[in-house]
């Protein structure tokens, strides 16, 4: 599943050719990575359910937050991004057009700009 996911998470074929082999090498070179990845996928829904009580605490978080998602990410889709945005009052939501799961590889300039212009703690967000 990992091999299929990584290839689909990056929109640009040239970027995929450059980065996917590196991601595969890192995955293969880390013996604990595969069991952890498979365990994560098996445990994901039970883990989310067990932590739902912590969601209410997110509404109290008062630091600057920018939620940056690709609008073409079929896994963590725009609905997930909007839910995070609802949980974090005062957060800013950015859905990057055409970007997939690895939005930082699909649109590095936009993501960098959003990070570099992030409001400082204590400042008012736009």
Features from the language model and the residues they span:
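Conserved alpha/beta-hydrolase catalytic His-Asp/Glu region
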Residues: 1-60
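Acidic catalytic loop of the alpha/beta-hydrolase fold
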Residues: 46-48, 72-76, 101
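Short alpha-helix in the alpha/beta-hydrolase fold that links the catalytic acid
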Residues: 53-55, 63, 77-86
């Amino acid at each position: 599943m990992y091999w299929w996911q990584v290839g689909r998470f990056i929109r640009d074929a040239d970027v995929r050719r450059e980065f996917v082999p590196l991601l595969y090498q890192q995955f293969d070179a880390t013996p604990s990575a595969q069991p952890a990845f498979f365990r994560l996928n098996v445990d994901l829904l039970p883990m989310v359910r067990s932590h739902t009580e912590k969601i209410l605490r997110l509404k109290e978080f008062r630091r600057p937050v920018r939620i940056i998602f690709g609008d073409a990410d079929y896994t963590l889709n725009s609905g997930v991004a909007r839910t995070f945005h609802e949980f974090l009052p005062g957060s800013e939501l950015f859905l990057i057009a055409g970007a997939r799961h690895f939005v930082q590889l699909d649109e590095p300039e936009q993501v960098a700009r959003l990070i570099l212009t992030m409001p400082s703690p204590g400042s008012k967000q736009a």
